[in-house]
């Protein structure tokens, strides 16, 4: 049976390959906080001005991808923390849903492929690796 933690059994890069040049987790968390704040300020500014807010699809996907990858990395680094596992599973699903809705997948297999049964975590690795950090 495929193992979403190690990536064994999936046609996707294993964590060591997908995240080989990823920033350290603390730096990535700080960068994600900044990106999240910027997106929230844009939404609030549009709301205050009474204008419709259309989030930048590219920035939104980048945020989701980086968040899902960080959660995956945290879950791998700290397998004893169930909350990290739950976050990794949930955020991988959110990225896959976004990519389905917006047709923004970059990798060999799209988010709806049977390849990702039973988990989208390897999908996150495929997409992160394709990103080319």
Mark where each language-model region is.
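Long, non-catalytic architectural segments outside compact domain cores
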Residues: 1-63, 74-133
